[in-house]
């Protein structure tokens, strides 16, 4: 209290302190980074290893298993997953949020290097990268030309664009979609090879021997030293065609005699188009936790600088930019701050009806809000959706203390007290209430420090900003506000016309409230059933309201994944994807861009819609129309997906349910029954499983006895098939200073049926040519094209899209029921992706909610020196929560992280009203009034400040509850919860709290008399 008195007597000191807060806040605002959400990305390290020609089973046993075995011992791993497929293994190591990304990367590199001695000698060295292999790119630069081939465009994208973009800070990787990388293709003709007695292994050996450049030493003279360079490398198709393979009867056999070499694309089974025009796309993938907007700005800057380096006929555009939504969403929240500020000022003026009195909160609000940016700066936060929502909420909060303080001083001035004395006396009287409400609000957010996982990271920044704003506002209310009040407020001999016109309304409101309160206190027993009804409503509605991690937002982007049956050719999935692309063009002809990308076995179509303000339909409506339309396209399967608010994995549906088993045979047995129940469940719109057992394969069974007697080894047979059919790399060549692969393979036309393999020959140890058909037997079979591990167990992930109106919480409940019905005790289940984040956040939030209630009760008990008074105040909490749930239920709002933030906020907000009433009633008891009269007078005297502070909070959040534009659903969820809770609790608090107070509050009058 001495601080209030001292600062009222020292106005310059109070002003200087306020200016310092403003100055530091402005500095913080101008230096803060901008992003969509706080950094909630778990550190993820990916390990990839290629082994050309090996099937999934070989990859799993020889590469994935040794790598996983070594990586598994690293501390701090949250999940370890892998996929083994034809020619490649990908391991994703997800760490806990507390683990440093660089430390995690170094640990993984160390373990991978130790595991390399267990890997096959001819596999590529494993690569370690600081990102999820399935991470969603944030931006794509589309490279197109009317006159250049995709090979040339790919080279430009690689040498010019990629080289520049991958040096941007916090970029994990830059990939080229639709890339046609140069390679030297050696096409083999098995018939001609048989005629000349040449095998694929001979070709490989010739490349190894004839395409080599080794250090050749030097010639040292007396005055000159010459370095020798043996020009053994080949660079053109002509040189490769002229390679001598052998000599037969005095005639040399060149490669051109048994095949031909050509400069062509390494990947011939992929293409990419944007709006029907072939292209290559350079996509930027950020590191976990990176600032996406800073990366995008750097990309724009680099591309502008690169314009002069690109040929005139090469044009670039941006296929998609996910940061557009982030920027627009942040701008929407910023404009909401201004709207909330204006609405709060209007409500203050309508209640106080004096521009001098209104001016004081007008000055205090910016001080608290700008000061919050300094809190964000010293805490290392960023300007993001949640910190800006915290600022919006703070608009209604920070004004409360200033209003209560100003009104208390103004009442004394109106009674004839001099402004200076009124400032001191008013501040002294209200000091305890201001401190109590501030501590209560800050205590709400203390449990969030203990929250773990994604929700903990998200809540932490939000809570720190609100708590910081409230602390600054209480400091300003106790120092700057009394000083301003003594300078600005004067006793008016006659009120203005607006005051005179509106005063009858407020007097009438006081009379109506006084009469209704007296009537309610005569039947105060009603307070108990009303409270019980509210508690029952909470129990019923909490179960009824669907739950999810975050509401779906209109991000102006839709993705369609296409998949054909296992074993389908590249041409088949290409034609199906183009068919879906044409369908999309007919449904949304005004789309900004439609990008189609196809590779062997799958395709993807990314639709970028016009900005929200430029169209009269939503992303969700378009997604539903496309979903309905593609049901008639039954040649293959297509899945429509929309990006979730949290989580950066591409191609994943919201429900990710992992089945873990001790053997793949058990999974194969149970999956059909499990999937059948998922397909039949109305909660799910679509479903799929990553583990398939339908990929056709031809097994080559070797007759070892026969091979041994004929002088052939298993290695001879395996290498012949490997170099003839798998497209195995035979070496490297250099062109324009860059290294490219030499790929050998039999012509497609001569390996399109199993019978073609019979025409392949191998050479025995006696030099004789043996037809492969004599040594092997071909058996058709099926096998999984990809094998999955999750936390070291063989696994299958069932992915499901949700039906319209269903949430992830309902989906997981149904999955748990299906698992209980179909799986035995040898199976384990786990969650992945968004599902895992949702389940973890739900338990964490409930813990924070309960801890907040306990903390507030204990803090209030300490402040009031009573265990009864805090109980009275805490009764406002169920009233508020019931109000929030009623509004959420009627408004169709889900229980998500934003609405839950609002509900936790309500605990502190509504407790403030209870504190004001109980504190004033206690003061009146101590001044001699009996308990019933004290609570009547306190409630009546606090009516206007409570209504004013509640109205300012509600109006400050009205722009959230009725939000439009980017990110609107998140703001609506939070705004609806807080507005609904405040409206219901404010009305009921004015009756329930006095009634319960009259029952159980300590009789302080008696205590005073005793003393």
Language-model regions: role of each:
Residues 1-5:
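Short, small-residue-biased leader/transition segments that mark boundaries at the very start
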Residues 6-34, 430, 498-550, 607, ...:
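Signature of alpha-helical transmembrane segments and their immediate interfacial
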Residues 12, 20-55, 78, 113-123, ...:
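Transmembrane helices with small-residue packing motifs
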Residues 25-31, 36, 342-411, 418, ...:
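Hydrophobic transmembrane alpha-helices and their membrane-interface caps
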Residues 37, 48, 90, 116, ...:
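Extracytoplasmic/periplasmic membrane-proximal domains and adjacent transmembrane bundles
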Residues 58-130, 191-212, 231-233, 571-653, ...:
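Solvent-exposed, membrane-proximal periplasmic/extracellular interface segments of envelope transport
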Residues 319, 326, 330, 406, ...:
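Helix-loop junctions and hydrophobic alpha-helical segments within the transmembrane domains
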Residues 395-409, 431-450, 457-499, 605, ...:
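Transmembrane alpha-helices and their membrane-interface boundaries in multi-pass membrane transporters
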């Amino acid at each position: 209290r001495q601080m209030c008195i001292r600062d009222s007597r020292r106005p310059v000191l109070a002003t200087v302190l306020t200016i310092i807060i403003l100055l530091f806040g402005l500095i913080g605002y101008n230096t803060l980074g901008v992003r969509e959400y706080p950094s909630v990305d778990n550190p993820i390290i990916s390990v990839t290893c290629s082994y050309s020609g090996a099937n999934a089973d070989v990859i799993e046993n020889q590469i994935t298993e040794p790598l996983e075995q070594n990586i598994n011992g690293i501390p701090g791993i949250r999940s370890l997953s892998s996929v083994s497929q034809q020619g490649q293994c990908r391991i994703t190591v997800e760490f806990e949020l507390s683990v440093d990304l660089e430390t995690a990367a170094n640990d993984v590199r160390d373990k991978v290097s130790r595991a390399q001695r267990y890997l096959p000698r001819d596999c590529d060295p494993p690569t370690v990268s600081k990102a999820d292999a399935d991470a969603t790119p944030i931006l794509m630069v589309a490279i197109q030309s009317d006159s250049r081939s995709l090979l040339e465009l790919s080279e430009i994208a690689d040498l010019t664009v990629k080289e520049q973009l991958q040096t941007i800070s916090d970029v994990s990787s830059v990939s080229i979609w639709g890339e046609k990388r140069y390679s030297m293709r050696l096409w083999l003709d098995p018939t001609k090879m048989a005629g000349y007695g040449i095998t694929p292994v001979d070709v490989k050996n010739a490349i190894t021997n004839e395409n080599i450049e080794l250090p050749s030493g030097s010639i040292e003279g007396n005055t000159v030293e010459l370095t020798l360079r043996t020009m053994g490398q080949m660079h053109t198709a002509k040189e490769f065609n002229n390679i001598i393979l052998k000599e037969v009867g005095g005639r040399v056999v060149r490669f051109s005699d048994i095949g031909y070499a050509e400069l062509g694309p390494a990947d011939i089974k992929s293409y990419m188009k944007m709006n029907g025009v072939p292209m290559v796309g350079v996509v930027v993938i950020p590191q976990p936790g990176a600032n996406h907007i800073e990366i995008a700005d750097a990309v724009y800057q680099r591309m502008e600088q690169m314009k002069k380096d690109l040929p005139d006929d090469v044009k670039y555009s941006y296929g998609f930019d996910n940061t557009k939504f982030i920027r627009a969403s942040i701008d929407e929240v910023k404009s909401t701050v201004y709207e909330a500020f204006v609405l709060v000022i209007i409500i203050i003026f309508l209640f106080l009806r004096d521009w001098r009195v209104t001016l004081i909160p007008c000055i205090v609000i910016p001080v608290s809000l700008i000061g919050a940016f300094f809190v964000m700066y010293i805490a290392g936060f960023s300007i993001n959706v949640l910190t800006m929502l915290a600022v919006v909420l703070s608009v209604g909060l920070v004004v409360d203390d200033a209003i209560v303080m100003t009104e208390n001083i103004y009442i004394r001035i109106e009674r004839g007290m001099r402004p200076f004395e009124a400032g001191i006396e008013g501040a002294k009287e209200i000091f305890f209430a201001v401190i109590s409400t501030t501590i209560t609000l800050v205590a709400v957010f203390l449990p969030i420090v203990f929250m773990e996982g994604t929700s903990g990271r998200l809540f932490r920044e939000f809570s720190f900003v609100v708590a910081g704003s409230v602390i600054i506002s209480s400091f300003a209310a106790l120092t700057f506000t009394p000083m301003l009040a003594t300078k600005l407020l004067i006793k008016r001999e006659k009120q203005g016309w607006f005051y005179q016109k509106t005063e009858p309304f407020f007097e009438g409101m006081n009379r109506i409230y006084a009469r209704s309160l007296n009537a309610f206190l005569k039947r105060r027993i009603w307070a108990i059933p009303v409270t019980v009804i509210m508690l029952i409503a909470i129990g019923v509605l909490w179960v009824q309201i669907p739950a999810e991690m975050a509401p779906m937002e209109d991000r102006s982007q839709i993705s369609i994944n296409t998949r054909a049956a296992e074993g389908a050719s590249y041409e088949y999935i290409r034609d199906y994807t183009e068919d879906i692309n044409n369908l999309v063009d007919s449904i949304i002809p005004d789309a900004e861009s439609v990008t189609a990308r196809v590779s062997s076995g799958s395709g993807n179509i990314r639709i970028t819609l016009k900005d929200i303000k430029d169209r009269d339909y939503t992303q969700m409506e378009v997604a539903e129309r496309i979903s309905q339309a593609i049901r008639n396209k039954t040649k293959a399967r297509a899945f429509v997906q929309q990006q979730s608010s949290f989580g950066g994995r591409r191609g994943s549906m919201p429900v990710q349910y992992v089945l873990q088993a001790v053997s793949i045979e058990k999974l194969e047995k149970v999956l059909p029954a499990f999937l059948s129940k998922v397909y039949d469940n109305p909660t799910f719109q679509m479903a799929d499983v990553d583990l398939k057992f339908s990929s056709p394969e031809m097994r080559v069974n070797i007759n070892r006895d026969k091979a041994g007697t004929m002088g052939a080894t298993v290695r001879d047979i395996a290498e012949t098939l490997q170099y003839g059919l798998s497209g195995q790399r035979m070496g490297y060549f250099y062109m324009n200073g860059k290294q490219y692969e030499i790929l050998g393979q039999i012509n497609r036309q001569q390996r399109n049926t199993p019978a073609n393999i019979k025409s392949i020959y191998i050479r025995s140890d006696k030099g004789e040519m043996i037809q492969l058909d004599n040594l092997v037997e071909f058996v058709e079979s099926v096998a999984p094209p990809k094998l999955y591990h999750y936390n070291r167990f063989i696994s299958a992930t069932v992915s499901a899209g949700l039906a319209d109106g269903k949430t992830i919480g309902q989906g997981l409940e149904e999955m748990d029921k299906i698992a209980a019905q179909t799986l035995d005790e040898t199976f384990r289940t786990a969650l992945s992706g968004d599902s895992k984040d949702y389940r973890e956040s739900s338990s964490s939030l409930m813990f924070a909610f309960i801890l907040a209630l306990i903390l507030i009760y204990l803090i209030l008990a300490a402040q009031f020196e009573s265990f009864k008074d805090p109980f009275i105040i805490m009764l406002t909490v169920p009233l508020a929560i019931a109000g929030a749930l009623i509004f959420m239920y009627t408004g169709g709002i889900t229980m998500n992280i934003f609405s839950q933030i609002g509900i936790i906020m309500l605990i502190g907000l509504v407790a403030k009203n209870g504190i004001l009433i109980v504190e004033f009633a206690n003061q009146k008891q101590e001044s001699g009034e009996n308990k019933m009269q004290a609570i009547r007078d306190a409630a009546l005297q606090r009516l206007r400040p409570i209504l004013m502070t509640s109205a300012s909070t509600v109006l400050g959040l009205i722009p959230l509850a009725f939000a439009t534009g980017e990110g609107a659903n998140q703001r609506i969820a939070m705004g609806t919860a807080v507005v609904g809770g405040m409206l219901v609790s404010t009305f009921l608090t004015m009756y329930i709290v006095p009634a319960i107070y009259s029952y159980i509050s300590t009789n302080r009058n008696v205590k005073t008399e005793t003393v």
